Amino acid sequence: MSKVGKFLRRTIGLIVAIGIGLLSLPGSARAQGQDCSVPASFYDAEPTLPKTTAAIASRQPVSIVAIGGASTLGRAAGSPDLAWPGRLAAALSSRFTAAPVTVDNRAVARQTAQEMASRLDREVIALKPTLVIWETGTTDAVQGTELDEFRQTIQAGIDRLRASGAEVVLMDMQFSRHTHAVINFDRYGSVLREVTDANEVPLFRRYDIMRHWAENGLFDLTTAGRDKLHLVASRLYDCIGRAVADFITRGALAGTGAPAANSGSHQ
């Protein structure tokens, strides 16, 4: 790889590590009342989460563990409560008031899938979660992890989590035209789709959802100034958190036969 190519890859790696993909909002007025709903067409099928559904229906505690990288850690928002797992907890708690919901954020910035997998036993399975949301693929794409190695790591991780009794949802990468121009995320996204399809594991299509938001003018892919970084990040994470809550809610309601709803705007 040329010196220019190496420089670009390192630069994009730093951008991705920030966890917001150079997203900013086109206008403050629109941002305050943003509608970041997700069309039903983004759900190929209702996620099947029988254990989570049963816990909600019986008003039992629902323990969720989120494991991932910088965009799950949410440091750019300035507070763990503003990261998408924190916003997910708030959204689910407001919807299922009779079933206590907790979301434990076990993210570490810039980790590959293999590095995350090495933490599963002690940091995820040890917590005996009802549901695990595994966000991965970004750092592997940046570092150029071999696809077969990536596939085997994801498969082994799913097997271990399921063997522990936890349900699993995978989350793919973020969308940004800036990073997509240099880093090939498509190959890793394809692997995630293949593995989740083969294992009948729900995949939260964050990449496609964020691209939909960008193409419809909700988010403008321009660089945010340092003074607005926390604000931009917190708004994005709130949208992601509520979209994941919609995803889980669809699975829970599908198990009861009730129609699924979409949160759309702020709760």
Predicted segments, located by residue:
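Active-site segments of SGNH/GDSL-like serine hydrolases
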Residues: 135-139, 157-189
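Catalytic His-Asp segment of secreted/periplasmic serine-dependent ester chemistry enzymes
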Residues: 175-267
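Bacterial N-terminal signal peptides that target proteins for export
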Residues: 2-15
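Solvent-exposed loop/turn segments at secondary-structure junctions
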Residues: 70-73, 108-114, 138-143, 174-178, ...
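Sec/Tat signal peptide C-region and signal peptidase I cleavage site
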Residues: 27-30
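Bacterial N-terminal signal peptides
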Residues: 13-24
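Serine-esterase "nucleophile elbow" of acetyl-processing enzymes
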Residues: 34-106, 121-128
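Internal alpha/beta domain cores that form substrate/cofactor-binding pockets in large enzymes
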Residues: 63-65, 99-127, 139-168
